């Protein structure tokens, strides 16, 4: 039953990822007073890319070729492990905070490395920026997760959500502050404005994706959309776990609808925020991200002093 639910979660995330990326395009168009594409346009784009031939630079190595399937596999694996439809993780080995951090770091490393490997100047700069973003994002994520892990007594995402939904936490203030910091870090991880530095359209022309085409580009776009859904699910599983049944069963079908509604609300909020700001200068990103680190550290201090 667990493996069936895990596969179902992965397939649902794969199916809805283009919908949520299309939703972001629709919100951008409406806020820019344009008609914009259909909300289903990303599905059509993926179908077109899958039908096109693929061209690979003769200067690139195997890294560029294995990166799209690796990125897709990591996103699917994390979707299988997170407690999306119930308060229990279908595959706890993939639902641990440390495992998730390392898996995201692995996909990010190969994503950046493929940009450098492609011998394209834009892709190389995009890869370097991707690594810089990881340095700026991961400290706040780690500190916020470590704070909640101390409060809940476990690094398992399902256990964290169960403690929070029942109110069985030793420091409510610390959990709230950690949630604020983690929400901000997740927003940065989504690559929304002003933090879309690696694929900055006006500057780097899609960055590490510049040398991909055909099925590889389709696979990569799908994987990046899945990663966004996984990151949103990661946040909701810990800090907004309400509406999910405690056990795996038929009620998981209703919970799947609740999960999709949560994701819809989160993506709408992120879409509005993204189109309400402009892209930050690359050199001042650190000034913005360190504020999030400060909030996460403050949450940890509250746990230490017992507030």
Each model region followed by its residue ranges:
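Cytosolic juxtamembrane amphipathic/interface segments immediately preceding
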Residues: 45-63, 121-125, 208, 212-216
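Alpha-helical transmembrane segments
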Residues: 6-17, 92-105, 167-188, 252-255
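Interfacial loop-to-transmembrane junctions
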Residues: 269-296
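Membrane-interface amphipathic/juxtamembrane segments adjacent to transmembrane helices
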Residues: 24-53
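Transmembrane alpha-helix boundary signature
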Residues: 54-57, 76-91, 111-120, 150, ...
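Juxtamembrane/interfacial segments at transmembrane-helix boundaries in multi-pass membrane proteins
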Residues: 90-93, 148-175
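Juxtamembrane boundary at the C-terminal end of a transmembrane helix
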Residues: 299-307
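Mid-bilayer segments of alpha-helical transmembrane spans in multi-pass integral membrane proteins
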Residues: 80, 99-114, 135-148, 152
